[in-house]
From Swiss-Prot:
The gene is RPS3. This is Small ribosomal subunit protein uS3m. It comes from Chondrus crispus (Carrageen Irish moss). Belongs to the universal ribosomal protein uS3 family. GO terms for molecular function: RNA binding. InterPro entries: KH_sf_prok-type, Ribosomal_S3_C_sf.
Length: 240
């Protein structure tokens, strides 16, 4: 059976939804390029500013209503940040307001605790690598953490609304050169639980990140597998 590295596109329109519904059919490509370019520049600036002040971006939410764009930014403390100094976020808000027109509204939300996402796990892996831990130890730490989280509940965005899911499995892959005595790259994989990339009734979160070390570039890939547990807003499986 076919196996996809990023299985999210396999489920678009069935269980998972698009991050954006912006369409360019019949429209000028120049306008689309300008929008995407400005969005990426804005997100890159926010990520660098937030990281400089000891925090990490958790995720974004873009919404448009009555010719106004609302950007909600959810951030969490870095793993080595023991103090929560939020004074610089007022300066960031002023910078963004001056940079963008009055049609852009920014909201900042502090998540004092990280939620279980694939993005969180890749950032945590990067932190462990920066602490100069070996790849096998990193895999053990991540697996022990995720094993404690198996069957835990999480609310996710379903195509008909929100749904409560449970974590049923995960897969972690670490690829790169970690040993100075060996010139060849190595791959470390660990899988636990139910891992079906082709099951359309499941939810999959995928994330990857590149880590730059003195020995070269390392790649981290994380898959989290969820199954429906409880449908919200009066929806049930019989209606699907």
């Amino acid at each position: 059976m076919a196996q996809k590295i990023n299985p999210i596109s396999f489920r678009l329109g069935t269980t998972q939804v698009w991050n954006s519904t912006l369409q360019i059919y019949g429209k000028s490509f120049k306008n689309y390029f300008s929008i995407v370019n400005n969005q990426l520049n804005l997100q890159n600036f926010i990520i660098r500013y937030v990281k400089l002040n000891g925090f990490q971006i958790n995720y974004y939410e873009w919404k448009m209503h009555k010719n106004k764009t609302f950007l909600s930014i959810y951030f969490s403390p870095s793993f080595n940040n023991g103090k929560l100094n939020l004074t610089n976020f007022k300066q960031l808000s002023n910078l963004l307001s001056n940079w963008c027109s009055n049609k852009f509204i920014f909201h900042f939300y502090l998540n004092s605790k990280w939620s279980l996402t694939s993005n969180f796990l890749t950032l945590y892996t990067k932190y462990l690598v920066e602490q100069k831990l070996g790849p096998k130890k990193i895999i053990v730490i991540l697996c022990n953490f995720l094993q404690d989280q198996l069957n835990s509940s999480k609310v996710m965005h379903f195509k008909f609304g929100f749904i409560e899911t449970k974590l049923v499995g995960f897969k972690i892959r670490l690829v790169g050169r970690f040993d100075s005595s060996n010139q060849m790259a190595k791959s470390f994989d660990q899988t636990i639980g139910t891992l079906s990339l082709t099951n359309l009734s499941s939810f999959v979160e995928y994330s990857n990140i590149e880590i730059h070390t003195k020995l070269g570039t390392c790649g981290v890939q994380v898959w989290l597998f969820f199954t429906p547990k409880k449908f919200i807003n009066g929806y049930n499986q019989k209606n699907s």
